[in-house]
């Protein structure tokens, strides 16, 4: 199935690219999410007419992500959790907890934007947490977990 991408999609292409995808991926994900449109002659003409508008919207999204990244880079967030001896937490700190702490400190962050490649945090200490704000913009936040 040939589609025209309406935004940049990781491992697939950039705005305006005409790509071949499996029919299920196109029908069930890209088209309903508004990330692509079928590559018919009418849609191609409509896309070319709207191209400047879509590129401007994509540039605005990236600019807002960069300003959020600059705000996040300056942040140092402390989360208090109950812990036993030797700093082992009762429970864990996940992406939702980190996103809530960042939002409370003034920068709106969704839990899907927080990246924890090693899984949830289960020890007290200092951690560098990656926040993926845009396909091209990633910020690192210093997270301090203390026993409370």
UniProtKB/Swiss-Prot annotation:
Pfam families: Ribosomal_L9_C, Ribosomal_L9_N. One of its GO terms (molecular function) is structural constituent of ribosome. GO terms for cellular component: ribonucleoprotein complex; ribosome. The lineage of its organism: Bacteria, Pseudomonadati, Pseudomonadota, Gammaproteobacteria, Pseudomonadales. One of its GO terms (biological process) is translation. Transmembrane segments: none annotated. This is Large ribosomal subunit protein bL9. Disulfide bonds: none annotated. InterPro entries: Ribosomal_bL9, Ribosomal_bL9/RNase_H1_N, Ribosomal_bL9_bac/chp, Ribosomal_bL9_C, Ribosomal_bL9_C_sf, Ribosomal_bL9_N, Ribosomal_bL9_N_sf. The gene is rplI. Belongs to the bacterial ribosomal protein bL9 family. It comes from Stutzerimonas stutzeri (strain A1501) (Pseudomonas stutzeri). Binds to the 23S rRNA. Keywords: Ribonucleoprotein, Ribosomal protein, RNA-binding, rRNA-binding.
């Amino acid at each position: 199935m040939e589609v025209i991408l309406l935004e940049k999609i990781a491992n697939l292409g950039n705005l305006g690219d005409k790509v071949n995808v499996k029919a299920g991926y196109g029908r069930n994900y890209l088209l309903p999410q508004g990330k692509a449109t079928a590559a018919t002659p009418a849609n191609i003409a409509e896309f070319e007419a709207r191209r400047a508008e879509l590129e401007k919207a994509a540039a605005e999204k990236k600019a807002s992500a960069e300003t959020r990244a600059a705000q996040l880079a300056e942040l140092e967030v402390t989360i208090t959790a109950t812990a036993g001896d030797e700093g082992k937490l009762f429970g864990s700190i996940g992406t939702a907890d980190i996103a809530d702490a960042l939002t409370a400190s003034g920068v709106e962050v969704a839990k899907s934007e927080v990246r924890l490649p090693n899984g949830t945090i289960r020890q007290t200490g200092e951690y560098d947490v990656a926040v993926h704000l845009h396909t091209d913009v990633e910020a690192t936040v210093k997270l301090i977990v203390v026993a409370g």
